């Protein structure tokens, strides 16, 4: 059940990222801004932003199962998203590993240059770890509830 929710929401988020990329291309064409040199970067940033949304989806599914509520996990998400913005002022190290800042990290919102290899590996490891941990916690919580 949990994996199907994550998969379906991830598909919706992938479509959303593709729409944003399409709007970028259309706006660049309309405004006659050269974009061909940066298209691969924007495609990669869309993919890494999508990976980061899977992290948030997994955390939110865990919170929804754990709290048995709809509104409270959304409130927690809003608070943690604001906290993610606050990590910008605390330091780059915390910003790069805070779960609710991962979309900004993946979309390269802070620096419009491609990932270095070490940044890319850190991004994949951090997001993979969050997805694994919160998926495992969600499955465990669901099993505990029904067993």
Regions found by a protein language model. Give the residues of each.
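Flexible domain-boundary/linker segments
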Residues: 18, 23-24, 32, 36, ...
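Membrane-interfacial segments
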Residues: 23, 27-35, 67, 71, ...
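Terminal transmembrane helical anchor/hairpin motif
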Residues: 74-147
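Functionally important transmembrane alpha-helices
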Residues: 55-86
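Secretory targeting signals
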Residues: 3-67, 107-113, 117-120
């Amino acid at each position: 059940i949990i994996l199907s929710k994550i998969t379906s929401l991830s598909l919706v988020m992938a479509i959303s990222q593709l729409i944003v990329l399409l709007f970028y291309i259309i706006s660049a064409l309309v405004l006659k801004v050269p974009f061909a040199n940066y298209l691969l970067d924007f495609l990669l940033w869309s993919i890494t932003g999508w990976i980061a949304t899977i992290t948030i989806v997994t955390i939110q599914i865990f919170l929804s199962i754990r709290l048995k509520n709809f509104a409270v996990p959304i409130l927690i998400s809003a608070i943690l998203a604001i906290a993610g913005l606050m990590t910008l002022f605390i330091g780059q190290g915390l910003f790069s590993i805070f779960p609710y800042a991962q979309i900004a990290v993946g979309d390269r919102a802070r620096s419009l240059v491609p990932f270095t290899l070490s940044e890319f590996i850190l991004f994949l490891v951090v997001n993979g770890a969050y997805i694994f941990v919160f998926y495992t916690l969600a499955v465990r919580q669901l099993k505990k509830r029904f067993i």
